[in-house]
Swiss-Prot record:
Disulfide pattern: none
HAMAP family: Glu_tRNA_synth_type1
Organism in which the protein naturally occurs: Nitratiruptor sp. (strain SB155-2)
Catalytic activity field: tRNA(Glu) + L-glutamate + ATP = L-glutamyl-tRNA(Glu) + AMP + diphosphate
Subunit structure: Monomer.
NCBIfam families: gltX_bact
Keyword Aminoacyl-tRNA synthetase: yes
Protein name: Glutamate--tRNA ligase 2
Main location (coarse class): cytoplasm
Subcellular location: Cytoplasm
Amino acid sequence: MIVTRFAPSPTGYLHIGGLRTALFNWLWARKNGGKFILRIEDTDLARNSEEATKAILEAFDWVGLDYDGDVAYQSKRFDIYKRYIQKLLDEGKAYYCYMSKEELDRLREEQMKRGERPRYDRRYRDFTGTPPQGVQPVVRIKAPLEGDIVFEDGIKGIVTIKAEELDDFIIARSDGTPTYNFVVAIDDALMGVTDVIRGDDHLYNTPKQIIVYEALGLPIPRFYHVPMILNEQGKKLSKRDGAMDVMEYKKMGYLPEALLNFLVRLGWSHGDQEIFSLQEMKELFDPKDINKSASAYNLSKLQWLNAHYIKNTPNEKLVKLLEEFGLFLSDHDKKEILLDALKERAKTLQELADMAKEILEAPKNYDEKGVKKALKGEWKAILELFLQKLKASDAHLPSDFHAIIEAVVEEKEIGFGKIGQPLRLALLGKMAGPDLSDVMAIIGKEETIARVEKLIKEKGNS
């Protein structure tokens, strides 16, 4: 059975690179009818944040990635790690190192002066003397002294690290807390993880973890190291580029379906297909197909995908989603016309809510450029004729309002723009927006009259 995991540290927000890693792991487990584990790597007690843990769980809930069993917390597993550290000490595969931080710093300075790579010199590896007084030792694992550590990466191919590049790394700090590479290997083995899909910034942690697996005789999982997401200039993604808390995307009005679709395409593809439902991703995804090179974050692509998903979201669902953006339409009798008119134009839910408010709320002022462009010639007479015909009608459907505009165009023998521009300015306060007939049907006959009369009153003598 395929078992994957996502193991964030709760020291900061979950950003989109992390969510992409989680998605890849989730897809591979679900495709194969396997298990997907969520593990919180909270051994760094000083830097952990309860808020960050909460935000990770909230993000998973929002995008709809479910996990199997309870969330695993490393901080609750210290007894397990201590047992395995003791096992390595008892078997002579690990040892206490009494070198102080000051001694280590001095050693590194001397090595750098000699042009050597700074590293621990293994002086306590086979130590049998009397330990120095007053030093709390760390525990180091005995790494191989020669040969190569070789593993096959599902994306990068065969990876070889020379043993001489690694020192006897610390597996327990002087306060007894275990270190990252040790606990990751223990947890992955004990949780039955078969496939580790993670960012390639972890590539050089892998040989250390393999040393732990081999020292304890534990099974080694398959590894897939995913290239980073870069900005459009090929540099590391910053917050300004989009490397922000996943929940910020929700606040900006992105749909989870769009974000997941966007992320799966950052580094993975299936022919020329761009739109993928979660079910399609599950059926088609294979980590072996992930690109070897880094992918570029493209905001316009995310907006294009989000617009697609908004357009295809049922109005009933949109009404509920838009409440988070201060737009309450459940009791509005023209909500269907409103949403149908706007969801073709919106890139985010925030945009959709803002556009709806621009229609539902009468304009407080008028765009200056629009005034200069639209309010010239006989605009006032044209709008007065429009009002006369509208007041005499019982217009309520878009087609009713459209017919009145057509009648004015015909009677005045003018182009559509001669009425369309001043009318749009009256209704919306600006020159761009959805179909005028839809706008009037949404706000109704009386409100249309009020807005047109207001423009004539304020600008008719200027």
